[in-house]
């Protein structure tokens, strides 16, 4: 799809904030082409608007938080992944609290509501951020790299010293179908001992077996088990889609991540954006673009030079 898209109608959600434990209502509204994704803290007077962009990220501990002045919105990554995965470029997000509702811990409820609201195409072309040179960020044994590619792809290597998780690897070659079918329903997860510790420090107050996969000493304690055998790494990729969408444009490049998380995802986007020699922004015309949603671009032969 080469044209910017927004929602056909409004979509409203109410749910618990994972970390605050508060009930929050969020409404997605259509927006004009060129708007981007803009959050509005409508519970404040006056309301505060915050663009969903890497330059507005103020915290990456446990989730991704954007802010402006004293106002902020946290845990935006699942909603951002759903918007990106459903092809939504422009939307207003009215929210009456400091955190996006966790829903069931995945992006699936957001995806379903966006599908019900419908998608409206504009007449304005999208701009794609095409990676020209590799960019890498490292933090100890954690690493994230984005390299030139004909498609948007994320390859994730996850490693935990726990028998229920161990090592998991998976790749997503991005398309709307693959994201919605294989990744959107993957839930956030945590270790029981860590959840108890966080709650004692005023965090994860809304966490439960209804909105997260919880791992005990002997494995997953959720009665229904896992939705996918490798649900953990699928969720890490879902998080990455949401975090990387804060680049502000559709990406064309291959992300290779090892033990990455919200902080390293943000550092990768920030490092990429501050190195204009490593990417180019391209606005495609219908005549120049004849690929499906996964944005393979046969015209860009220079990527293989």
Curated annotation (Swiss-Prot):
Catalytic activity reported: a UDP-3-O-[(3R)-3-hydroxyacyl]-N-acetyl-alpha-D-glucosamine + H2O = a UDP-3-O-[(3R)-3-hydroxyacyl]-alpha-D-glucosamine + acetate
Q: Which InterPro entries match?
A: Ribosomal_Su5_D2-typ_SF (IPR020568), UDP-acyl_GlcNac_deAcase (IPR004463), UDP-acyl_GlcNac_deAcase_C (IPR011334), UDP-acyl_N-AcGlcN_deAcase_N (IPR015870)
Q: List GO terms (cellular component aspect).
A: membrane
**Positions contributing to Zn(2+) binding:** 78, 235, 239
Look up the record and name the cofactor or cofactors this protein needs: Zn(2+)
Q: In which pathway does it act?
A: Glycolipid biosynthesis; lipid IV(A) biosynthesis; lipid IV(A) from (3R)-3-hydroxytetradecanoyl-[acyl-carrier-protein] and UDP-N-acetyl-alpha-D-glucosamine: step 2/6
Give the Pfam families listed for this entry: LpxC
Q: What is its EC number?
A: 3.5.1.108
Uppermost EC category: hydrolase
**SUPFAM superfamilies in alphabetical order:** Ribosomal protein S5 domain 2-like
Any one Gene Ontology BP term = lipid A biosynthetic process
Q: Which domain of life is it from?
A: Bacteria
Q: Name one GO molecular function term.
A: metal ion binding
Alphabetical keyword list: Hydrolase, Lipid A biosynthesis, Lipid biosynthesis, Lipid metabolism, Metal-binding, Zinc
Query: Keyword Ribonucleoprotein, does the record have it?
Result: no
- State the active site: 262 (proton donor)
**What does this chain do?**
Catalyzes the hydrolysis of UDP-3-O-myristoyl-N-acetylglucosamine to form UDP-3-O-myristoylglucosamine and acetate, the committed step in lipid A biosynthesis.
Q: Which family does it belong to?
A: Belongs to the LpxC family.
Q: Which PANTHER family match?
A: UDP-3-O-ACYL-N-ACETYLGLUCOSAMINE DEACETYLASE 1, MITOCHONDRIAL-RELATED
Name used for this protein in its record: UDP-3-O-acyl-N-acetylglucosamine deacetylase
């Amino acid at each position: 799809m080469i044209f910017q898209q927004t929602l056909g109608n409004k979509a409203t959600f109410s749910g618990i904030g994972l970390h605050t434990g508060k009930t929050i209502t969020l409404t997605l509204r259509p927006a004009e082409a060129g708007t981007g994704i803009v959050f509005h803290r409508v519970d404040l007077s006056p309301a505060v608007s915050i663009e969903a962009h890497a330059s507005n990220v103020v915290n990456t501990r446990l989730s991704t938080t954007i802010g402006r002045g004293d106002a902020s919105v946290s845990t935006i990554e699942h909603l951002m992944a759903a918007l990106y995965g459903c092809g939504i470029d422009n939307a207003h997000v009215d929210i009456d609290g400091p955190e996006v509702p966790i829903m069931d811990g995945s992006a699936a409820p957001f995806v379903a509501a966006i599908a019900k609201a419908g998608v409206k195409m504009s007449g304005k072309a999208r701009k794609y951020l095409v990676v020209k040179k590799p960019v890498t960020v490292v933090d100890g044994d954690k690493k994230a790299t984005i390299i030139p590619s004909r498609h948007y792809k994320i390859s994730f290597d996850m490693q935990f010293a726990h028998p229920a998780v161990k090592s998991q690897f998976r790749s997503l070659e991005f398309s709307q179908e693959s994201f919605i079918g294989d990744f959107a329903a993957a839930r956030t997860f945590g270790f029981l001992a860590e959840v108890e510790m966080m709650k004692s420090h005023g965090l994860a107050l809304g966490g439960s077996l209804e909105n997260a996969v919880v791992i005990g000493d002997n494995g997953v304690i959720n009665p229904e088990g896992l939705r996918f055998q490798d649900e953990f790494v699928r969720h890490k990729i879902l998080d990455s889609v949401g975090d990387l969408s804060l680049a502000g444009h559709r990406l064309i490049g291959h992300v290779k991540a090892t033990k990455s998380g919200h902080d390293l995802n943000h550092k990768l986007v920030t490092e990429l954006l501050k190195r204009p020699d490593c990417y180019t922004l391209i606005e495609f015309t219908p005549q120049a673009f004849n690929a499906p949603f996964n944005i393979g671009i046969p015209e860009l032969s220079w990527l293989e030079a």
